[in-house]
Amino acid sequence: MAIFGEAETWVAIAFVILLGVFAYLGVHRTVLQALDKRRDRIKAELDEARKLKDEAAKLLADYRARRASAEREAQAIVDSAKADAERIAAEAKAKLEDFVARRTKTAESKIALAEAQALADVRAAAAEAAVAAASRILSESVKGNLADELLSKGIQEVRGKLN
C-alpha cells in the first residue's frame, strides 16, 4: 500500500473523483453547450464577414464601373467642347474675314467715289478756267455780235467736252 503514500496517487484519485463529480453534475454538457455557442457565434461572424466582403466587392465593382463611366463621359464632354471650340473659332474666323472683306470693299468704294468726285471737280475747275480764258481771249480779240456768238458756242463746246 505504498502506492497510497505517494502524493501523485492522491492527485490522480482527486482528479478522477473531480471528473466523476463533473460528469454527475453535467458540467461537460455545459462546457459543450458553451463551446457550441461559441462555435455558432464564430460561424455567424465568419458568415457576416463573408457577406460584408461580398458587399464590399460589389461596391468596389460598382465604383469602378461608375468611375469608368464618368471618365468616358468626361472625355466625351471634353471632346465635344473641343469640337465646339474649333467650330466657333472657324465661324469667328469666317465672320471676321467676311467683315474685313466688306470693310475693304466699302473703303475701296469710298476711295473710288472720292477719286471720281475729285476728278469731276478738277474737270469742272479746268472747264471754268478754260471758259474764262477763252472768254477773255475772245473778248479782247473779237468785238460785237460775232464775239458774243463765238463766246457762247465756245463755252458750250468746252463744257460739253470737259463734262
Curated annotation (Swiss-Prot):
The chain crosses the membrane at residues 7-27. It is found in: Cell inner membrane. CDD domains: ATP-synt_Fo_b. GO terms for cellular component: plasma membrane; proton-transporting ATP synthase complex. Keywords: ATP synthesis, Cell inner membrane, Cell membrane, CF(0), Hydrogen ion transport, Ion transport, Membrane, Transmembrane, Transmembrane helix, Transport. It comes from the Bacteria. Disulfide bonds: none annotated. It is a single-pass membrane protein. Its main location: membrane. GO terms for molecular function: proton-transporting ATP synthase activity, rotational mechanism; proton-transporting ATPase activity, rotational mechanism. Pfam families: ATP-synt_B. F(1)F(0) ATP synthase produces ATP from ADP in the presence of a proton or sodium gradient. F-type ATPases consist of two structural domains, F(1) containing the extramembraneous catalytic core and F(0) containing the membrane proton channel, linked together by a central stalk and a peripheral stalk. During catalysis, ATP synthesis in the catalytic domain of F(1) is coupled via a rotary mechanism of the central stalk subunits to proton translocation. PANTHER family: ATP SYNTHASE SUBUNIT B (PTHR33445:SF1), ATP SYNTHASE SUBUNIT B', CHLOROPLASTIC (PTHR33445). Belongs to the ATPase B chain family. F-type ATPases have 2 components, F(1) - the catalytic core - and F(0) - the membrane proton channel. F(1) has five subunits: alpha(3), beta(3), gamma(1), delta(1), epsilon(1). F(0) has three main subunits: a(1), b(2) and c(10-14). The alpha and beta chains form an alternating ring which encloses part of the gamma chain. F(1) is attached to F(0) by a central stalk formed by the gamma and epsilon chains, while a peripheral stalk is formed by the delta and b chains. This is ATP synthase subunit b 1. It comes from Rhodopseudomonas palustris (strain TIE-1).
